[in-house]
Amino acid sequence: MSNQHIEELNDQQIVRREKMMALAEQGIDPFGKRFDRTANSAELKEKYADKTKEELHELNETAIVAGRLMTKRGKGKVGFAHLQDREGQIQLYVRKDSVSEDNYEIFKKADLGDFIGVEGEVMRTDMGELSIKATKLTHLSKSLRPLPEKFHGLTDIETIYRKRHLDLISNRESFDRFVTRSKMISEIRRYLDGLDFLEVETPVLHNEAGGAAARPFVTHHNAQNIDMVLRIATELHLKRLIVGGMERVYEIGRIFRNEGMDATHNPEFTSIEVYQAYADYLDIMNLTEGIIQHAAKAVKGDGPIDYQGTEIRINEPFKRVHMVDAIKEVTGVDFWPEMTVEEAIALAKEKQVPLEKHFTSVGHIINAFFEEFVEETLVQPTFVFGHPVEVSPLAKKNPEDTRFTDRFELFIMTKEYANAFTELNDPIDQLSRFEAQAQAKELGDDEATGIDYDFVEALEYGMPPTGGLGIGIDRLCMLLTNTTTIRDVLLFPTMKP
């Protein structure tokens, strides 16, 4: 450590370093070693929840706990403290006549933030709080910086996101939110594994962006002297596995899109994609409903959920509506009759729908109408199906009306939560769609995909009829934890330097 760094330390940091050195001089490692616990705070509270002070005294049971010192009070020969572990907090009752003199000195000199191990009798105070009456204390690790203000936690948003470790220490609500996220993902895995799906891993580095309409991050591979992109989806590699005969696969992983940031978008995020051979979009619709309802039940229990004051009936069957019917219901404009692109553009101008240069078909106009007028009305879980071919380059055409595809998106609280379709398995049609996307890219559509010839070649070997699905894990977590910004469900959201 440089002298310059020492000079920058504040008084509290200097005192903590002096205590660190004092521990070392006593032969105590300031940063400790392994420690065996017999229970955590939650296990103790559950085990002894119905025991009175007198009953606990009769039981005379001991426990060994460990955690971070969060509060400490007292003077003379008696002290109280709270120890925080992964499950919560437990109170400590420390008397000088119950521990050794050296042990009591460890307690007296311990700072908030230090880690200690405690062995002692399980008791209940006169105030009724379950506590550990210490008989032995072990110093485990020294905290060289003071914690955030202990009663209110962090309040500065920038610090919360940049220093998530401090947020987790001081804000139990935030800590529990991320535990819920992990449990939600585990339950999704459990659900799919129970349906005989196989979890797989596919590359993050791609030669060509594909599988979604999004702008990629470009990087460079030095050894091969080639530019590569970070994946914007896992779709095309997963469908190659269907070609290879795996039949039921899924992947949960990070996706990277070089686009804007807002309350529901981060440049890197987590998605799950699922593919099932011999299935269509209706089968996948049922699967999607099952995944989300199972995850919701696992972390929120039965019944509807509350999201920002709105009751979401996530436990009931999801509404299903064709995109054209949804547009007609909201705007009165009917796109079922066939029309020219000029007629569609005239309707768009009449309704003041923003138009882009690459909107060269009726399908583009239909999609624009939907985004402009319908999305904001979809509060309860709703499957919108029948997207136009022009905006669905990887979806199979509907056999009864080839202007549309067997595709759906799931909307809840006006936001998209899932995208799925009967997969296009005709390599000739797929190449034609890729070429149309490449043309749109030339016309200024930054989100249009290029041509993935390797994927087309894979399809030429034959892919069975297949249904595929993508779900945004982060948005689903936002819904199930009642949060309004994606940064609150990402442990380390993207931040400016």
Swiss-Prot record:
GO terms for cellular component: cytosol. It is found in: Cytoplasm. SUPFAM superfamilies: Class II aaRS and biotin synthetases (SSF55681), Nucleic acid-binding proteins (SSF50249). It catalyses: tRNA(Lys) + L-lysine + ATP = L-lysyl-tRNA(Lys) + AMP + diphosphate. Binds 3 Mg(2+) ions per subunit. The keyword Metal-binding applies. It holds the Pfam family tRNA_anti-codon. InterPro entries: Aa-tRNA-synt_II, aa-tRNA-synth_II, aa-tRNA-synth_II/BPL/LPL, Lys-tRNA-ligase_II, Lys-tRNA-ligase_II_N, Lys-tRNA-synth_II_C, NA-bd_OB-fold, NA-bd_OB_tRNA. Keywords: Aminoacyl-tRNA synthetase, ATP-binding, Cytoplasm, Ligase, Magnesium, Metal-binding, Nucleotide-binding, Protein biosynthesis. Homodimer. Its cofactor is Mg(2+). CDD domains: LysRS_core, LysRS_N. One of its GO terms (molecular function) is lysine-tRNA ligase activity. Belongs to the class-II aminoacyl-tRNA synthetase family. Mg(2+) 1 binds at residues 409, 416. GO terms for biological process: lysyl-tRNA aminoacylation. Mg(2+) 2 binds at residue 416. This is Lysine--tRNA ligase. Its EC number is 6.1.1.6.
